[in-house]
Amino acid sequence: MATATSKPKAVERIKMRIRKGDTVQVIAGKDKGKTGAVLRTLPNENRVIVEGVNMRTRHEKPSQEGESGRIVTEEASLHASNVMLYSTDKKVASRVEIVVEKDGTKKRKLKKTGEVLD
């Protein structure tokens, strides 16, 4: 008789105010202080992939005869709480607030600089 396996518990989602293409700064971990553009967001896992940050090496087997294997470096994901939006003009990281315009649209605004992102 087979045993029942439990499903992994769903991660509680946090509000991610980070989007693809944003410039962020890492505020915790081994890459603290580095900045880069967000390549991809994983909202169900509360994680982001940042260009040039948290690099991992992976060994690939050869795909064809006569071809040698290789070592590939690629970005691994970071938890969204470990990055903060970064103002490239003022060179400072800042928290984000959501501002509702008079026409009802929502915009993201950096609290320190007042810079509107959307």
From Swiss-Prot:
SMART domains: KOW. CDD domains: KOW_RPL26. Part of the 50S ribosomal subunit. Belongs to the universal ribosomal protein uL24 family. This is Large ribosomal subunit protein uL24. It holds the Pfam family ribosomal_L24. NCBIfam families: rplX_bact. Keywords: Ribonucleoprotein, Ribosomal protein, RNA-binding, rRNA-binding. PANTHER family: MITOCHONDRIAL RIBOSOMAL PROTEIN L24 (PTHR12903). GO terms for cellular component: ribonucleoprotein complex; ribosome. The keyword RNA-binding applies. GO terms for molecular function: rRNA binding; structural constituent of ribosome. One of two assembly initiator proteins, it binds directly to the 5'-end of the 23S rRNA, where it nucleates assembly of the 50S subunit. One of the proteins that surrounds the polypeptide exit tunnel on the outside of the subunit. InterPro entries: KOW, Rib_uL2_dom2, Ribosomal_uL24, Ribosomal_uL24_CS, Ribosomal_uL24_KOW, Translation_prot_SH3-like_sf. GO terms for biological process: translation. Transmembrane segments: none annotated.
